[in-house]
Amino acid sequence: MPQLNPAPWFMIFMFTWAIFLTILPPKVMAHTFPNEPSPQGMTTPKTAPWNWPWH
């Protein structure tokens, strides 16, 4: 049963992951978002207490 021989498949597996780990991370990290988040002010918004009229 040749499919149980790990010799060729293990090297293919290792080379594939080596290629993925050397090519893909720079491409993913070079991605820029079109809308950069703007920093919010440190002031907290004024909230008025809201009393529910229980009738």
UniProtKB/Swiss-Prot annotation:
Any single GO BP term: proton motive force-driven ATP synthesis
Annotated GO MF terms = proton transmembrane transporter activity
Q: Supply one GO CC term from the record.
A: proton-transporting ATP synthase complex
TM spans (from-to): 4-24
**Subcellular location as annotated:** Mitochondrion membrane
Q: Where is this region: Disordered?
A: 34-55
**UniProt xrefs under InterPro entries:** ATP8_metazoa, ATPase_protein_8
Keywords attached to this Swiss-Prot or TrEMBL record, sorted alphabetically, are:
ATP synthesis, CF(0), Hydrogen ion transport, Ion transport, Membrane, Mitochondrion, Transmembrane, Transmembrane helix, Transport
Out of the domains of life, which is the source?
Eukaryota
Enumerate the Pfam families for this protein.
ATP-synt_8
| Membrane topology listed for this record | Single-pass membrane protein
Function description: Subunit 8, of the mitochondrial membrane ATP synthase complex (F(1)F(0) ATP synthase or Complex V) that produces ATP from ADP in the presence of a proton gradient across the membrane which is generated by electron transport complexes of the respiratory chain. ATP synthase complex consist of a soluble F(1) head domain - the catalytic core - and a membrane F(1) domain - the membrane proton channel. These two domains are linked by a central stalk rotating inside the F(1) region and a stationary peripheral stalk.
Q: How does it assemble?
A: Component of the ATP synthase complex composed at least of ATP5F1A/subunit alpha, ATP5F1B/subunit beta, ATP5MC1/subunit c (homooctomer), MT-ATP6/subunit a, MT-ATP8/subunit 8, ATP5ME/subunit e, ATP5MF/subunit f, ATP5MG/subunit g, ATP5MK/subunit k, ATP5MJ/subunit j, ATP5F1C/subunit gamma, ATP5F1D/subunit delta, ATP5F1E/subunit epsilon, ATP5PF/subunit F6, ATP5PB/subunit b, ATP5PD/subunit d, ATP5PO/subunit OSCP.
Q: Which family does it belong to?
A: Belongs to the ATPase protein 8 family.
Mind telling me which PANTHER family this protein's record contains?
ATP SYNTHASE PROTEIN 8
Protein name per Swiss-Prot or TrEMBL: ATP synthase F(0) complex subunit 8
**Source species of the chain:** Gadus morhua
The UniProt gene name for this protein comes to mt-atp8
